[in-house]
Amino acid sequence: MPLLDIRNLTIEFKTSEGWVKAVDRVSMTLSEGEIRGLVGESGSGKSLIAKAICGVAKDNWRVTADRMRFDDIDLLRLSSRERRKLVGHNVSMIFQEPQSCLDPSERVGRQLMQNIPAWTYKGRWWQRLGWRKRRAIELLHRVGIKDHKDAMRSFPYELTDGECQKVMIAIALANQPRLLIADEPTNSMEPTTQAQIFRLLTRLNQNSNTTILLISHDLQMLSQWADKINVLYCGQTVETAPSKDLVTMPHHPYTQALIRAIPDFGSAMPHKSRLNTLPGAIPLLEQLPIGCRLGPRCPYAQRECIITPRLTGAKNHLYACHFPLNMERE
């Protein structure tokens, strides 16, 4: 039984010109202990999917789905109070730019202690304060912060971006989640710090069997850490496959374009040579093309592309394209 099962998730925004689809019929199934990657350009709907899973929706949103089940519990049939309790006990989310998520006027130790849920405590009520402090120290050690005294006394601006992100991960782990959503957790960080954060998340997955949903725009990075990757373009899933298969045998032109856009530092490039990019720009949500949304930019587009392609293929490798690539190699 999957931990999270989503079928045909659609998210719409209400604007002055009517309803606009930001996410269109996205499906996803996450198993217990899996690391799933969600990759796409800015505006492809990655963060919206994460917020829909957590139940964080604004008043001008309309979220619909054929199925949205967490541990075989239908999230769509729960009241807001019941869903908040279920998500609060089982799901945590790590946001990008950790320093903007922490209170700059409060010491890190106090913020961490305040975010430890009371329901995780099993002892006497008068021992709760001492337990919170010990639990906060344990969480800091767990995420790789050895000098807990200095970290707990510090304000967020006194820590580096990597240390702040480790504190955010410690806060996310305080409720012992079964699903951890990391929304670009290493954005604008140095490569060494990025590797530390991803090694930490992988270790948490291996030791605690925590399911992790990694959201990023960096396909090369996701392919190193995720078991399976979903590729999004303009709010639609264009390809889903295990990481190794996706990188070595992409079937969708957009996935191929993402792979070709990764710079190759192993070979010299001619002077003033162009990088591999798709022509044109991402269409506006109010002016989406007919049929395949990549059609106007796709080098392989043909007349049939005015018909919207459906996700097809084998069970482990799905693609939404009328003229898939690399089919002769299978």
Swiss-Prot record:
Domain ABC transporter positions: 6-259
Reported consequences of knocking out the gene: Loss of resistance to protamine.
Family to which this protein belongs: Belongs to the ABC transporter superfamily.
Species of the source: Salmonella typhimurium (strain LT2 / SGSC1412 / ATCC 700720)
Covalent S-S links between cysteines: none
InterPro entries: AAA+_ATPase, ABC_Ni/Peptide_Import, ABC_transporter-like_ATP-bd, Oligopep_ABC_C, P-loop_NTPase
GO cellular component terms listed in the entry, alphabetical order: plasma membrane
NCBIfam families: oligo_HPY, PRK15093.1
SUPFAM superfamilies, per database record: P-loop containing nucleoside triphosphate hydrolases (SSF52540)
PANTHER family from the UniProt entry: OLIGOPEPTIDE TRANSPORT ATP-BINDING PROTEIN APPD (PTHR43297), PUTRESCINE EXPORT SYSTEM ATP-BINDING PROTEIN SAPD (PTHR43297:SF4)
Induction: Part of the sapA-sapB-sapC-sapD-sapF operon, RNA detected in mid-log phase cells.
Binding site for ATP: G40, E41, S42, G43, S44, G45, K46, S47
Main subcellular location: membrane
Designated name of the protein: Peptide transport system ATP-binding protein SapD
GO BP, sorted A to Z: peptide transport; protein transport
Keywords: ATP-binding, Cell inner membrane, Cell membrane, Membrane, Nucleotide-binding, Peptide transport, Protein transport, Transport
Taxonomic lineage: Bacteria, Pseudomonadati, Pseudomonadota, Gammaproteobacteria, Enterobacterales
Membrane-related topology note: Peripheral membrane protein
Molecular function GO terms recorded: ATP binding; ATP hydrolysis activity
Pfam families in UniProt: ABC_tran (PF00005), oligo_HPY (PF08352)
Source organism, top-level taxon: Bacteria
Subcellular location: Cell inner membrane
Protein function: Involved in a peptide intake transport system that plays a role in the resistance to antimicrobial peptides.
